[in-house]
Amino acid sequence: MQHYVTPDLCDAYPDLVQVLEPMFSNFGGRDSFGGQIVTIKCFEDNSLVKEQVELDGKGKVLVVDGGGSLRRALLGDMLAEKAAKNGWEGLVIYGCVRDVDVLIQTDVGVQALASHPMKTDKRGIGDLNVVVTFAGVTFRPGEYVYADNNGVLVSPKPLKMPE
């Protein structure tokens, strides 16, 4: 597992990276994570999140545009454990998570807005691998995202930690 330090990436690639507005907190068991972006756009329905974490996620980060909803949790312990088991590097969720005491012990990165105990409805509604924009940044499938306790940033190309 590669360790990323976002301030060092910003210093090394100032013209390449875009930094998200500082509204995310780290809820996962990894302090830092990064990888190729897979996007989901959904609202209070995590059907596609469930579907994607069951697939191989090696080298990938699931970016979920949940519309910023603070009324339902798009990720909980069971889906986080599936994501870890299937090799996902992490998830960036523009929305809420739950089961935070378990998430922090799960070997996957999780950045989200807040915690909320209510689960979502599963209606099968959402879009996969579409361009999404939140926190002042646009996420394109196939580009790259990096996160740590300092923040979250996006790059059109893979980044290497400076020596």
Curated annotation (Swiss-Prot):
Family listed: Belongs to the class II aldolase/RraA-like family.
InterPro entries in alphabetical order: RraA, RraA/RraA-like, RraA/RraA-like_sf
Top EC class of this enzyme: lyase
The record's free-text note on cofactor binding: Divalent metal cation.
Residues engaged in binding a divalent metal cation: 99
Gene Ontology BP terms: regulation of RNA metabolic process
Stored SUPFAM superfamilies: RraA-like
Complex formation: Homotrimer.
Annotated substrate binding sites: 76-79, 98
GO molecular function per UniProt: 4-hydroxy-4-methyl-2-oxoglutarate aldolase activity; metal ion binding; oxaloacetate decarboxylase activity; ribonuclease inhibitor activity
UniProt entry tagged with the keyword Lyase: yes
Keywords of the record: Lyase, Metal-binding
Parts forming coiled coils: none
Purpose of the protein: Catalyzes the aldol cleavage of 4-hydroxy-4-methyl-2-oxoglutarate (HMG) into 2 molecules of pyruvate. Also contains a secondary oxaloacetate (OAA) decarboxylase activity due to the common pyruvate enolate transition state formed following C-C bond cleavage in the retro-aldol and decarboxylation reactions.
Catalytic activity: 4-hydroxy-4-methyl-2-oxoglutarate = 2 pyruvate; oxaloacetate + H(+) = pyruvate + CO2
Cofactor dependence: a divalent metal cation
Protein name, UniProt field: Putative 4-hydroxy-4-methyl-2-oxoglutarate aldolase
EC number: 4.1.3.17, 4.1.1.112
